[in-house]
């Protein structure tokens, strides 16, 4: 049995509120400014943006939108192993021309220090016609990777996923967060999943992923935030950010879905850093 739209919206808003509260505390000087927006075709959302001391720019957005025609087509077929994990993209004929509902939380944090990693989190729920599924993921993009930080981040995700899901979803992240024209990964990975058919068990799993985010990320910030850096480090960080921008504008599913579905432009481009160079 799938959860109700109201249950999912409430859970996602609660997740947004917990993350915003903890990251505000961590920043120590800035605060998230919330701004409501409405989508002309139906629904809307709430932007929460931080311009802080520790975090040069960050955003944690909630959205809940609906419309008459689903703007994208699911990709690929699931293997038997994927089916065991609950992964099954609906067939194109199931969703073509169908009304849709989508709600989710999307976060990206761009720290000021080159030694504190960029982080991304997304959880989402989509209904199209009679089909309903969850998707999401989280990944780490350090300019200067530390093995112990990568191990901690992935360890927290393995704990919440279990071995089988972690193996599939971490590989999915490696494949998804890949910048083809650069022939390189965006960062040090994480997890990515999509088309998890909606059920109470999957709903709980997605909530658990959201709750694991702070455990995975906050210790890394606390460990690196006082590390000194040079102007050369800063300039290299800005050039590295260019790859983040390239991925988000060319490949990111959330960006493309938002643009195709008439989403809020400010919220869609919230993921972009405030300063970047090539």
Language-model segments: residues:
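Internal mixed beta-strand/loop scaffold within catalytic domains of large alpha/beta enzymes
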Residues: 46-136
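A generic structural motif
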Residues: 4, 113, 129, 140-146, ...
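Long, charged, mostly alpha-helical binding arms that flank functional sites
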Residues: 158-205, 219-222
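Flexible loop/turn segments at secondary-structure boundaries
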Residues: 70, 115-116, 228, 253-257
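Long, contiguous binding/interaction regions
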Residues: 111, 255-278
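Glycine-rich, often proline-containing surface loops adjacent to acidic residues and nearby aromatics
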Residues: 58-59, 101-103, 132-139, 184-198, ...
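Gly/Pro-rich turn-and-neighbor structural signature
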Residues: 2-86, 200-250
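Compact, glycine/acidic-enriched structural inserts
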Residues: 129-172
